[in-house]
Amino acid sequence: MEAFPWAPRSPRRGRAPPPMALVPSARYVSAPGPAHPQPFSSWNDYLGLATLITKAVDGEPRFGCARGGNGGGGSPPSSSSSSCCSPHTGAGPGALGPALGPPDYDEDDDDDSDEPGSRGRYLGSALELRALELCAGPAEAGLLEERFAELSPFAGRAAAVLLGCAPAAAAAATTTSEATPREERAPAWAAEPRLHAASGAAAARLLKPELQVCVFCRNNKEAMALYTTHILKGPDGRVLCPVLRRYTCPLCGASGDNAHTIKYCPLSKVPPPPARPPPRSARDGPPGKKLR
């Protein structure tokens, strides 16, 4: 978050408020203190917001939605929370909107509003994931897994393992991590897409036929419809190109399966024998010289 220079709201108020810090209770409160020793947790603050708000409304008497409150001890917590959180509910001192809104500073009680416990005392413990006992039993763990299923990239009970909600799974994960070095371990959810991608590419290569190209016809500027229908030579070395098979080498006379051009003819690579010098005679001597 960007920090902007603070400007006093009135000439009377000349000192800046203490620095703010985000804590797992999803509230901006004063700098770290004994009331909020835990670090910021994205699972508690963002992904589990619906669960946390529901549990906070069910268990907080300040909102007027406490279990068994208002003479409705037999009503389930979900009905009370839904009626309290309904947009048609009238605004009042116990409504959820004003309670969860940003704290309103009053110029007359500056000293009281700056205390760390005054702003988050009624939400500090109610919105804690561990304090709400979401993972107390198998039913609660399953409910939490369902809530995080669509938001989490992990499948099955991996979300419960990450949140510490499955003791057996957590113990198994701890044993595996102790037995296997950190460098050799790779999460299954990260390796599985790569395997699928690799297998898909290999299958595509196997199913897609390779394009046949005859280099002889292509180099001779033949049409693409012609040089993409065959190849020059087969695996056994025989010539398969119909154009080259009809060609006859002028040096050795080869054609058909052994057809080739002059450039690749074996006779063209043999150096010609050196020319013999003519026999020396009197006629070959330089003019003007007489032989004795």
Swiss-Prot record:
GO terms for biological process: cell migration; cerebellar neuron development; epithelial cell migration; mRNA destabilization; negative regulation of translation; oogenesis; post-transcriptional regulation of gene expression; regulation of cell growth. A motif (C2HC 1) lies at residues 214-241. Residues 76-87 have a biased composition (Low complexity). Zn(2+) 1 binds at residues 214, 217, 230, 241. Residues 104-115 have a biased composition (Acidic residues). Residues 1-41, 68-121, 268-292 are annotated as: Disordered. Induction: Down-regulated by E-cadherin. GO terms for molecular function: enzyme activator activity; mRNA binding; translation repressor activity; zinc ion binding. A zinc finger (Nanos-type) spans 213-267. GO terms for cellular component: cytoplasm; perinuclear region of cytoplasm. Its main location: cytoplasm. Residues 40-56 are annotated as: Essential for its translational repressor activity. Zn(2+) 2 binds at residues 249, 252, 260, 265. Keywords: Cytoplasm, Disease variant, Metal-binding, Repressor, RNA-binding, Translation regulation, Zinc, Zinc-finger. May act as a translational repressor which regulates translation of specific mRNAs by forming a complex with PUM2 that associates with the 3'-UTR of mRNA targets. Capable of interfering with the proadhesive and anti-invasive functions of E-cadherin. Up-regulates the production of MMP14 to promote tumor cell invasion. The Nanos-type zinc finger is composed of two C2HC motifs, each motif binding one molecule of zinc. It is essential for the translation repression activity of the protein. It is linked to Spermatogenic failure 12: An infertility disorder caused by spermatogenesis defects. It results in decreased sperm motility, concentration, and multiple sperm structural defects. Non-obstructive azoospermia, oligozoospermia and oligo-astheno-teratozoospermia are features observed in SPGF12 patients. Belongs to the nanos family. This is Nanos homolog 1. It comes from Homo sapiens (Human). The gene is NANOS1.
